[in-house]
C-alpha cells in the first residue's frame, strides 16, 4: 500500500505581513513589562524582519499565573471532556492546514529553511503530530489493580500541571507542536518560550490556538532570551515541568535550575554526534543518499545529524567519491527561491562556529574534498563541505558542528566500529546500512542511541518515541511514551466491605 501523495508545492507568499509580535497570555496580546523589544532577522539577507516584544521574568510570572489559573480545579479546561480536548487539537491542525502557505513562508523567511521542506515536511509533520495527539486525548487512562485484602485499587493518569516549554530555532514550528500537542492532550497548561531567533511562527500559532477555541490561559507564549525568560521558566516555583530541546550545555543549566527550585519534572532533547555505519555489503546508492541527507538536511542544523560516517575500508574510496559528487550538486541561495536546496545558517554565531570547526579539520589533517568556506558575501551561508581521512580524535569527529559538514571515517571490523561509534558522550541517534539481517540486529542492539535507523536515516513519525541516551537527554517525545511524560500516575486504594473476584 503506497503512502498518500504529497501536496503540490505552491509559490511562497510574496507579500508576507507579520501580524503578531507581542506576548500571548490569557488569549490576549501584551507588551513586555520592561517595554523592551528585540530584532528578528532574515538569515539569508541579515536584514531585520520586525521587532518582537522581549519577555523576561516579569512576563513569565504573568504567564505562569494565567496558566495556573486555567489549571484550577473546576476551571473550564479541567472540567472539559477529554474528547473535547482532542477536538480542539484537531481544529488547530485544520487551521494550520488552512494557513499552511503563510506558515511555510514565515518559517523559510525567519528560519532559513528551504521553502519546499517547510511546506511539505515541517507543516506535514506538525499536522500529523497534532492529529496523533488529538486521537490520544480520550484514551489516556489508568487501570484497576487486584490488591490484597478488601481493597479496590485503581490508577489515574493525571496532567502534571503548568508546563514550561522551551523551543529551539532549528525546527521552531515542529518542536512547538511536539511540545504543546502531548501536553494539551493530557490536560496540562503551558508557558512556551520560542527561540529568540525564530519566534514568528509560534506567535502566529498563538492566534490559531485562540481561534480554535482553547480557553484563556491554557497556552501562553513569551518570546525572549534564554538567560532571562528561559531561566525564569526553569527556576519558577510554580512551574511543574519543563521541557527543552536544544544544546547539551543549556540542558544542564535547565536541569540544575529545576533541581535548585521545586524539583520540577524535566524532559530534555539535546545534542548529538550520531554515527552512521556503512558496511561493504550495503546498497551504496541508498547509503550515500541517506547519509548525505542525514547530515546536509536543513544546512546540517539537526540534532540527529549523521555527523560521523563510518565506512568499511573496501568501499571507502567509492563512498567518498559519490558523497563528494552529491554534495557538489547543491544550489545555495535565498530559501524562498525555487530551485534552491540549501539556505543559510541561522545566525552569525552559528556560521562562525561552523567555519572555525572546518578550519580545525584542515589543521588537524583531514582531507578537504569540497567546500570548506563561506558562500557569498551576504547572509550566513556555508559551502557544503566533505572531509575524508578523518580520525576519531579530531574536533570535527567529536564536537557537534550543526552545519553542512560531512566527516567520513574508515573502519575494518564490526567490533571496531561499534566501539568507536559508542565512544561519545552523546547517544541520540545512529544509522547502519547492510543487507545482512544478523549484522543489522546485532549492531543495532549494541549501539547506544535512542533511535537506530537501518538502511534509512532520519525517518521520524508521530507514532514513534524519540529521545536520547547519555548526554543527549532525558525522557521521550512522540508516541505513547511521549504522552506519558506529561502525566503523573496516581494510585487510589479504597476500603470496601467485601472484595469479589
Swiss-Prot record:
> Would the keyword Cytoplasm turn up in this protein's UniProt record?
yes
Give GO BP annotations, semicolon-separated.
9-cis-retinoic acid biosynthetic process; apoptotic process; cellular detoxification of aldehyde; embryonic eye morphogenesis; fructosamine catabolic process; fructose catabolic process; gamma-aminobutyric acid biosynthetic process; maintenance of lens transparency
List residue numbers at the site (Transition state stabilizer). Answer: 170
How is this protein activated or inhibited?
The aminobutyraldehyde dehydrogenase activity is negatively regulated by ethanol in vivo.
Q: In which tissues is it expressed?
A: Expressed in retina. Expressed in lens and cornea (at protein level). Expressed by midbrain dopamine neurons.
Q: Which residues carry this modification: N-acetylserine?
A: 2
Write down which residues bear the modification named Phosphothreonine: 337
UniProt source species: Mus musculus (Mouse)
The GO terms this record gives for MF are: 3-chloroallyl aldehyde dehydrogenase activity; 3-deoxyglucosone dehydrogenase activity; acetaldehyde dehydrogenase (NAD+) activity; aldehyde dehydrogenase (NAD+) activity; aminobutyraldehyde dehydrogenase (NAD+) activity; benzaldehyde dehydrogenase (NAD+) activity; NAD binding; retinal dehydrogenase activity
Family stated for the protein in its record: Belongs to the aldehyde dehydrogenase family.
> Which residues catalyse the reaction?
269, 303
Entry binding sites for NAD(+): 167-170, 193-196, 226-227, 246-247, 269-271, 349-353, 400-402
Q: Where in the cell is it found?
A: Cytoplasm, Cytosol; Cell projection, Axon
Q: What class of enzyme is it?
A: oxidoreductase
Any one GO CC term of this protein is: axon
- Which portions of the sequence form the region Mediates interaction with PRMT3? 336-501
The record's keywords, sorted A to Z, are: Acetylation, Cell projection, Cytoplasm, Lipid metabolism, NAD, Oxidoreductase, Phosphoprotein
Read off the PROSITE patterns from this record.
Answer: ALDEHYDE_DEHYDR_CYS (PS00070), ALDEHYDE_DEHYDR_GLU (PS00687)
What is the protein name for this chain?
Aldehyde dehydrogenase 1A1
List every position bearing Phosphoserine: 413
Mod. after translation: The N-terminus is blocked most probably by acetylation.
Q: Which residues carry this modification: N6-acetyllysine?
A: 91, 128, 252, 353, 367, 410, 419, 435, 495
Q: What EC identifiers does the entry list? A: 1.2.1.19, 1.2.1.28, 1.2.1.3, 1.2.1.36
Its annotated function is as follows: Cytosolic dehydrogenase that catalyzes the irreversible oxidation of a wide range of aldehydes to their corresponding carboxylic acid. Functions downstream of retinol dehydrogenases and catalyzes the oxidation of retinaldehyde into retinoic acid, the second step in the oxidation of retinol/vitamin A into retinoic acid. This pathway is crucial to control the levels of retinol and retinoic acid, two important molecules which excess can be teratogenic and cytotoxic.
What pathway annotation does it carry? Cofactor metabolism; retinol metabolism
InterPro entries referenced in this protein's UniProt entry, alphabetically: Ald_DH/histidinol_DH, Ald_DH_C, Ald_DH_CS_CYS, Ald_DH_CS_GLU, Ald_DH_N, Aldehyde_DH_dom
